Structures are given as structure tokens and as C-alpha cells.
């Protein structure tokens, strides 16, 4: 095993994502329209199609900020064997990756919108093959080939990251030796899980008539639905002083994370309403967003009031010793105390997860059956 070799190969494939930039310019999309819709988004489709649109929106969130990434990143950084003094470099690495993903996603959306606008293929392709064919028909063979190469590149990155994330998680849970620094003989279980996942994914792709586009969308929507729970789990962990010491979250980070979770839950509520009431209108969706926003403001006000009554601002975090901090061994950590409010919140989150996942599956089945 060689972590350095794996990372160099992965970075080379990540650079391949930049192929989407020439795809964008070859398609000649309307940049002004993209800029306007970025600031003032619109929901396409009539009232009966809004459920499908919301499914797509949550899927985009799920594929951009996938919950498995939260666990992959911490396992990968640990496997890299770097110390906290390199944290600034890791943050810079993360920011560069975010920029590449956002630029690539925007380029792909702009190119496909330009290629399919006003054509018979608009809304009638179901997978990446249909997308590539449409791009080639619109901009020539070079456009289609570049997209196909970028798609293959992204698929390999996904196979690397998702399978590795699961292998890390399974090995952590069962106490199996796991590291890319180890060879196959010293980490058989880790590499077995890794290889089995890649093999299973390849087998699904090779099944004749497999609805790959629908499967992809369904998986990403489930990722978007699972993201709030993963974010809450991460938020609780990031506020545990015994685990993170001087690295615990500050108030600004907690506020931002809570807002992100609130937005994701709001999207899931809208998806729930659109599945239960297929004829829901865009105005009713706006009303749901207003109600959820008001509920969030009330919750924030209640939390602030309770904190002020309890003795004012929270104790300042001592950031001294960040570069030398090490988490105590797991066996020495105390079980975290769960307040009544936290127990109620976790119970509500479990209920949300169960209902949202069932409704996502129902909607995916409806799409598969053509309803």
C-alpha cells in the first residue's frame, strides 16, 4: 500500500474535472441568463411537476455536499498522518476543491441547458448517455467526446472516494486494520470491502436495461435527505470539548451549520408536501418556506433567550495548544450527557429521517412507473 501513490493518482483525476470548462465554451451558453437565474431562481414545470423538481433540487444538494464526504474527509486526513499544525493547508485544499466542483457544476449545467433548449430532447433523456448524445448533436463530436471523458473521470473519482469512505467506516466500526499505507496482507478486511463495493457497482452498471439515471438520482436524493442527520451528528461532535479541546466550534460556525441544517430540512418538508399533494403550486411552496423560516427564527430566539437567562454568553473557547492537541484514547472518553431537549431533538430527527426516506422511495418508484 502507498498512500502517496493513491493521492497523486486521485489528484490527477480531479484535475480532469477541468475538462468541463472547454465543454462550457464549446456549447456557447447564455452567460447573462445563467447569472440572472443564479440570483433569481425559478421553478420550472407546472404544479403537477413540482414534486419532481424538488426531488432534483435535493439530489443536487446531495451530490454536492454528500453525507459520506463528512466521514471520508476525517478518515482520509487521519490516514494521511498529518498533525493539527497542517490544518491551514487542509482548509486551503478543501477550498480549492470546492471552487473546482462549483465551477464544473455550473459549466455542465450551462452547457446542457444551451444544448437542449428548444429541442425535442429537452426533458426526455434519462441518463448520461442521452446527455452525451444531445451535446454531440448540438456542438459536434468534440463536445460529446470531451463530456464523455469528463464523465469517465468523475466516475473513477466517485468509485475511489465513495468505496474508500465505506471501507474506512466499516473498518472503524469493526476494529479492522485500515490504511492505504498498509499492504493487502496487513489490511485484508479493509481492501476486501473496498474491492467488493467497486465490484458490486460495476455489476449493477452491467445489468441490461438497468435504469442508471433513475438510480443515480435516487441515491443522490437519499444523500440529500440524510445530510441533515449527518450534519447534526457532526455538529454535536464538533462541540464536544473532551474530543476536540481547543478545536471545538465557535458560535459563528454553529450558527452557520444550524442554518444549513434548517435549509435542508425545509427542502425535505417541501418534498414531503409535494409527494403527498402532487398538485401543490409554487405559491404554496413559498408559503411552506416562509413558515419554516419563521419557525427557525423562533427557535433561534428561544435558544438565545434561554442562554441569556442561564448566565449570559457562553464561556470563551481557549484556543491555546491547537497545534499540539491530541484526542484522548476512545476508551478514556466520558459518555456525553444528553439533556431532555437534545433527546427530543434527536427523536424528531429520527422521525424525519424515516418519513423522508419513505417518501423519497415512493417518489422514485412513481418516476420509474411513469407516474
Residue ranges and their predicted role:
Residues 3, 9-12, 180-195, 217-272, ...:
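C-terminal membrane-solvent junction of multi-pass transporters and transport-like membrane proteins
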Residues 1, 14-45, 54-74, 233-240, ...:
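Hydrophobic alpha-helical segments and their helix-loop junctions in multi-pass secondary transporters
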Residues 96, 100, 142, 146, ...:
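Loop-to-transmembrane helix boundary motifs in multi-pass membrane proteins
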Residues 50-55, 252-312, 350-357, 363:
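A generic transmembrane alpha-helix motif of multi-pass inner-membrane proteins
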Amino acid at each position: 500500500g502507498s498512500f502517496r501513490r493513491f493521492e497523486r493518482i486521485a489528484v490527477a483525476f480531479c484535475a480532469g474535472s477541468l475538462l468541463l470548462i472547454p465543454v462550457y465554451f464549446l456549447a456557447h451558453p447564455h452567460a447573462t441568463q445563467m447569472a440572472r437565474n443564479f440570483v433569481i431562481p425559478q421553478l420550472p414545470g407546472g404544479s403537477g411537476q413540482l414534486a419532481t423538481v424538488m426531488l432534483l433540487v435535493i439530489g443536487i444538494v446531495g451530490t454536492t455536499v454528500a453525507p459520506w464526504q463528512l466521514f471520508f474527509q476525517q478518515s482520509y486526513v487521519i490516514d494521511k498522518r498529518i498533525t493539527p499544525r497542517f490544518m491551514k493547508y487542509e482548509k486551503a485544499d478543501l477550498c480549492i476543491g470546492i471552487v473546482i466542483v462549483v465551477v464544473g457544476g455550473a459549466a455542465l449545467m450551462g452547457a446542457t441547458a444551451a444544448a437542449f433548449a428548444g429541442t425535442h430532447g429537452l426533458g426526455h433523456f434519462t441518463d448520461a448517455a442521452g446527455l452525451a448524445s444531445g451535446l454531440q448533436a448540438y456542438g459536434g463530436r468534440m463536445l460529446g467526446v470531451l463530456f464523455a471523458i469528463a464523465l469517465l473521470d468523475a466516475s473513477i473519482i466517485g468509485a475511489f472516494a465513495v468505496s474508500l469512505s465505506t471501507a474506512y467506516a466499516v473498518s472503524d466500526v469493526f476494529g479492522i486494520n485500515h490504511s492505504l499505507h498498509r499492504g493487502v496482507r496487513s489490511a485484508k478486511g479493509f481492501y476486501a470491502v473496498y474491492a467488493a463495493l467497486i465490484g458490486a457497482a460495476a455489476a449493477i452498471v452491467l445489468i441490461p436495461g438497468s435504469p442508471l439515471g433513475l438510480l443515480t438520482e435516487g441515491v443522490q436524493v437519499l444523500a440529500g435527505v440524510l445530510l441533515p442527520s449527518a450534519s447534526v451528528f457532526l455538529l454535536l461532535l464538533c462541540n464536544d470539548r473532551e474530543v476536540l479541546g481547543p478545536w471545538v466550534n465557535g458560535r459563528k460556525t454553529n450558527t452557520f451549520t444550524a442554518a444549513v441544517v434548517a435549509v435542508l430540512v425545509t427542502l425535505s418538508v417541501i418534498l414531503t408536501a409535494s409527494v403527498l399533494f402532487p398538485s401543490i403550486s409554487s405559491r404554496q411552496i413559498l408559503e411552506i418556506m416562509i413558515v419554516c423560516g419563521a419557525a427557525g427564527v423562533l427557535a433561534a430566539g428561544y435558544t438565545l433567550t434561554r442562554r441569556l437567562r442561564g448566565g449570559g454568553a457562553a464561556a470563551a473557547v481557549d484556543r491555546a495548544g491547537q497545534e499540539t492537541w491530541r484526542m484522548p484514547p476512545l476508551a478514556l472518553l466520558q459518555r456525553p450527557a444528553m439533556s431532555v431537549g437534545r433527546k427530543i431533538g434527536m427523536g424528531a430527527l429520527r422521525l424525519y429521517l424515516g418519513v423522508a426516506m419513505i417518501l423519497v422511495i415512493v417518489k422514485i418508484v412513481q418516476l420509474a412507473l411513469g407516474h
